[in-house]
Structure formats: C-alpha cells, structure tokens
Amino acid sequence: MKKIYVAGGCFWGVQGFLKTIKGIKKTTVGYANSLLENPTYELVKSHVTDAVETVEVIYDENILSLKDIVKKLFAVIDPTARNYQGPDHGRQYRNGFYFVDQEDGVMLRELMLEFSKKYEKPLATEILPLDNYYLAEDYHQDYFDKHPNAVCHIKF
C-alpha cells in the first residue's frame, strides 16, 4: 500500500470522490502543513495556520497509479485555480499533492510538467513534502456518507 495526501478544495467532496475510485483503500480528511500543532477547523478557516484541507489516501499501487490519481482529480477540479475551488475561497482550499516518499515527489513534479501542457493557464497545484497532517474533527470525516444531499464543488 502507498500513501499520498491530496488537496482539491473542500475536503468533503475530494474525499467523497476519491472513495469511489477502485484501488483506494482508505481515506481520512485533515489539515496538512499547518504552522500550528493540532489546528481546529475554526483556526484553519481564520487563516492563521496556513494549513490546507487535505485527504489522506491509502491506495493499492497494483491497482491504481499515482498518475491515475492525479488524472482523476484533475478531471473534477480546476488545477489552475489558486486558493479556491468552486464557491470556496481561501488558502485552505488550494490544490496540491503532499508526499511522504521522495520518489513520489519526483514523479509528481514530472506529472505536473506533463499535465501543464493540457491547460492554457499555469497549474497552481502545490507539490510539497508533507510536513505534518492532523485529522479533522469527526463531523468532517466521511461527510457525504452522513449527508448525501450536501452541496459540493465536485460532481460524483
């Protein structure tokens, strides 16, 4: 199993979408690369943490490649949008991939060069090592399982 941290706007929709993909075994939502330890949603949305709403993804690389994950995410978000997706605005909604394996970092940078040729505007996608990840509050976990009619920037 491999692990990657994915951001693409509000983490509710990103998690809901990723859970539909064959090969993804487990997801959680949380806050990545925070300047403060153990940030809360209230702190994140106040912009004092610089954390990004992120989905931790554990996947079977024998079924799904990192490139597949990038391609599928880019099909449902705007990777050229800086600090927003859909109606959600703010740095916590930026898009990116945060890696724990240096080889994944190299691969992601190569993929960004490849995918950038498909867009007129430059990609705003962050590719950074994961400095930290804190689980979001329980009410954020698997949000669309609990609230299937909630509004989302991602259609799935």
Curated annotation (Swiss-Prot):
This is Peptide methionine sulfoxide reductase MsrA. The keyword Disulfide bond does not apply. It comes from the Bacteria. The keyword Oxidoreductase applies. Coiled coil: none annotated. Has an important function as a repair enzyme for proteins that have been inactivated by oxidation. Catalyzes the reversible oxidation-reduction of methionine sulfoxide in proteins to methionine. GO terms for biological process: cellular response to oxidative stress; protein modification process. The gene is msrA. One of its GO terms (molecular function) is peptide-methionine (S)-S-oxide reductase activity. It catalyses: L-methionyl-[protein] + [thioredoxin]-disulfide + H2O = L-methionyl-(S)-S-oxide-[protein] + [thioredoxin]-dithiol; [thioredoxin]-disulfide + L-methionine + H2O = L-methionine (S)-S-oxide + [thioredoxin]-dithiol. Belongs to the MsrA Met sulfoxide reductase family. Keywords: Oxidoreductase. Its EC number is 1.8.4.11. The active site is at residue 10. NCBIfam families: msrA. One of its GO terms (cellular component) is cytoplasm.
